[in-house]
């Protein structure tokens, strides 16, 4: 649910944000990210349930992933998906660790630690920080839009 003033004029940016989940348990923080990026004017696209447990689910979506200007990638447990995605695409990737999993991974600590230790170029927000991930993606989308508009 998003509340706005009647006079609010939402921007329509020439930039897209892909919001990716490893599994269904990542849906809530990913949903927050998608809503915030969308409210900031970016076109958004949800790509759900493409975790590393079955890599073909991810590789089947590579063209779709590569079509976006920025990606928010949510994952719990060991948090591997954002690292893998960042190695496969040539756009900014924002890792969104999620507090799912068992044992040490159950509070999102393992996912956060794994993303912070990534050898790929990856930015990371705090555990379950969908709002923050969406806002960061929206800011990147704004800059991409401004660059494209200036080039026209």
Per-segment meaning from a language model:
Residues 12-57:
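Glycine-rich phosphate/diphosphate-binding loop of Rossmann-like nucleotide-binding domains
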């Amino acid at each position: 649910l998003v509340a706005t003033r009647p006079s609010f004029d939402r921007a329509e940016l020439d930039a897209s944000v892909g919001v990716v989940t490893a599994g269904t348990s990542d849906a809530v923080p990913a949903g927050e990210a998608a809503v915030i990026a969308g409210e900031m004017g970016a076109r958004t696209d949800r790509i759900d349930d493409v975790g590393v447990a079955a890599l073909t689910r991810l590789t089947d979506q590579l063209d779709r992933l590569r079509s976006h200007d920025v990606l928010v990638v949510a994952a719990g447990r060991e948090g591997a998906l954002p690292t893998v995605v960042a190695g496969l695409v040539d756009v900014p990737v924002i890792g969104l660790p999620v507090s799912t999993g068992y044992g040490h991974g159950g509070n999102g600590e393992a996912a956060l630690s794994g993303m912070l230790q990534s050898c790929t170029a990856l930015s990371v927000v705090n555990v379950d920080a969908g709002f923050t991930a969406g806002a960061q993606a929206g800011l990147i989308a704004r800059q991409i839009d401004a660059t494209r508009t200036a080039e026209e």
